[in-house]
């Protein structure tokens, strides 16, 4: 896990691997893929988890408790399958996604007093929302 902000990046990594039966590895991979398919909206483009989990809670639970699943701005939508995913239902523009992120943050703050922190990093200009 990488924490903090800034321009740090990985330039190398060391791995310690041990031999394993390929059938067992494939079985684990399939199980992992099935869990992902059951819990994440893989049929739509997204950037994955939008918000970090606040201490002692889950961003998805807070978003769902705020009744924001399915909220849409244009083609950007809070996934009805996993509330911490914003999906692109076609031609979502960056402005729509940014506005939806800001709205979710504000609603969760208003209802629960918790400020959700983005997991993603926006690169480039941020539009006025």
What is the predicted role of each segment?
Residues 1-99, 107-129:
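Phosphate/pyrophosphate- and phosphate-bearing ligand-binding catalytic cores of soluble enzymes
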């Amino acid at each position: 896990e990488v924490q903090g902000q800034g321009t740090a990046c990985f330039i190398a990594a060391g791995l310690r691997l041990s031999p394993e039966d390929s059938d067992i590895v494939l079985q684990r991979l399939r199980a992992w893929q099935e869990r992902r398919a059951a819990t994440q909206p893989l049929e739509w483009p997204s950037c994955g988890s939008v918000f970090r989990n606040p201490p002692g809670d889950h961003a998805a639970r807070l978003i769902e408790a705020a009744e924001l699943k399915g909220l849409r701005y244009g083609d950007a939508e809070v996934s009805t399958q996993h509330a911490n995913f914003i999906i692109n239902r076609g031609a979502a523009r960056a402005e729509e996604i940014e506005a939806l992120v800001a709205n979710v943050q504000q609603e969760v703050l208003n209802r629960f007093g918790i400020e959700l922190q983005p997991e993603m990093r926006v690169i480039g200009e941020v539009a006025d929302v």
